[in-house]
């Protein structure tokens, strides 16, 4: 349980000290339970993580609405990296920290955007994107977190591969499927090409370049273009891939 919590809350920004102690005690007090029961406890922790993080993001969004430009000039210091810091003792302390984080992020955006309202809107979009990413977590994702936390206790070099990851691995090993020959990332809900792979279809076509955005994907099965805005990158990749040749 300690390994799982360390993996999902690496910066000590979601759970309080007492909450973590309770989770650990719960797992230790039920050491004689079967795998299914322990797995259920793990899922409960992950669902608590999702709900808490969503609530904190919503709190940040509400806090931003109350800020004025003059508020950004007050002097304040925060630890951006809290991995080695003690956990907060109360939820109110976590909320205060998230308010400071939102303020810091808004200042960083304003340095580039200059206009206060534009910066606020951009930050709100980022927070909405993070909320959507949370909503897009699947049971496979949660199960992978639990299993990888467990396997790392026995062998730090071993990892559990979810069905999605297994499929990717088999595709890469067999070379039976291919995509467009490009590395992708997500930027505010839009899948963007960050690098073209040498010898891949993208370079050969001459039609695709770095920083191109993918907002729709056409397939042989569907005559219409599928809108992939706000999709997970791995889902976009899955749709793009097709038989080699």
Where do the language-model regions lie?
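PDZ/PDZ-like domain segments forming the peptide/carboxylate-binding groove
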Residues: 3-6, 13-32, 38-58, 62-104, ...
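Long, acidic serine/threonine- and proline-rich intrinsically disordered regions
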Residues: 88, 92-145
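Buried hydrophobic packing residues in well-ordered domains
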Residues: 146, 182, 193, 227-236
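Stable alpha-helical elements in mature extracytoplasmic
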Residues: 1-4, 41-45, 49-52, 115, ...
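Generic, well-ordered alpha-helical scaffold segments in large soluble proteins
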Residues: 145-156, 172, 183, 196-199, ...
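Long, charge-dense accessory insertions within large macromolecular proteins
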Residues: 127-175
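Short beta-strands and strand-coil junctions in structured, solvent-facing domains, enriched
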Residues: 140, 156, 202-204, 222-225
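PDZ domains, with a preference for the canonical peptide-binding region formed by the helix
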Residues: 213-245
């Amino acid at each position: 349980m300690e390994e799982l919590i360390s993996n999902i809350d690496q910066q000590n920004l979601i759970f309080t000290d007492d909450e973590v102690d309770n989770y650990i005690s719960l797992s230790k007090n039920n050491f004689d339970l079967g795998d299914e029961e322990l797995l259920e406890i793990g899922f409960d922790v992950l669902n608590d993580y999702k709900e808490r993080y969503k609530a904190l993001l919503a709190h940040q969004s509400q806090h931003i609405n109350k800020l004025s430009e003059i508020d950004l000039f007050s002097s304040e210091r925060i630890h951006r990296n809290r991995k080695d810091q003690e956990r907060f003792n109360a939820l109110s302390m976590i909320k205060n920290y998230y308010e400071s984080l939102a303020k810091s992020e808004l200042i960083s955006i304003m340095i580039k955007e200059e206009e206060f309202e534009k910066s606020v809107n951009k930050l709100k979009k980022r927070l909405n994107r993070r909320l959507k990413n949370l909503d897009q977590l699947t049971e496979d994702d949660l199960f992978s977190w639990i299993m990888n936390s467990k396997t790392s206790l026995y062998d730090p070099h071993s990892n559990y591969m979810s069905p999605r990851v297994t499929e990717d691995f088999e595709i890469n090993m067999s070379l039976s499927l291919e995509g467009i020959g490009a590395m992708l990332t997500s930027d505010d809900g839009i899948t963007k090409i960050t690098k073209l792979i040498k010898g891949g279809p993208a370079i050969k076509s001459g039609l695709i370049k770095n920083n191109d955005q993918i907002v729709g994907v056409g397939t042989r099965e569907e005559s219409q273009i599928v809108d992939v805005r706000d999709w997970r990158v791995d889902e976009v990749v899955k749709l793009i891939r097709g038989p080699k040749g």
